[in-house]
Amino acid sequence: MTEIVTALIEQAACQIILDADGINALAAHKDVLQRAARPVVLTPHAGEFARLSGVKNASPEFLAQFAQENRCVLLYKGHRTLIAAPDGALYRNHSGNPGMAKGGCGDVLAGMLTALCGQGIPAVQAACAAAWLHGRAGDLAANTLSEYGMTPSDMLGLLPRVLKRYNSREW
């Protein structure tokens, strides 16, 4: 799998987004990030980032430094998701809640990020937007179903309500 991930990063003409095992496959070869045609988006939680960087409990400053040194966009998942850009900028998402710390929530986020990048939105902006929209859907799910009762599928189902509020078109 490592060879496939490395080859994709080096050769792909489209935006690459790596989550979960894609990040784990990259851990021993993170130098490939510097050879990518465009900044790769990585979406690790703390454990995945520790395997990738060798640093547990990374500070926001370290995340920004990592993104800058490795020419990547880092969407560091947590209760307050952080987005670090290749230029060293750091963004903090303030939507979301602890009920989102469930298996599958990161998959929903990765799918949202992929959809935004697929529409041509630049990676950093797409990462910030996906994190915020994901968190708002999580907040709506928690308000409706409770943090304990909500599931990633509930969040996905509530996403149209979140988007409708910010739709600029009058129908």
Which residues does each predicted region cover?
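Short glycine- and Lys/Arg-enriched binding-loop motifs that mark or flank ligand-binding interfaces
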Residues: L18, A84, R92-S95, G99-G103, ...
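Glycine-rich phosphate/dinucleotide-binding loop and adjoining beta-alpha-beta core of small-molecule
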Residues: M1-S95, K164-W171
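Short, conserved loop/turn and helix-capping segments at secondary-structure boundaries
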Residues: N57-P60, G99, G103, G149
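Charged C-terminal helix
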Residues: A137-W171
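Short beta-alpha connecting loops at secondary-structure transitions
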Residues: G47-S53, H94-M100, A110, T114, ...
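Short, well-structured alpha-helical segments that form the helix of a local strand-helix-strand
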Residues: S59-Q68, A123-A137, P152-P160
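Short, small-residue alpha-helix embedded
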Residues: R51, K102-L133
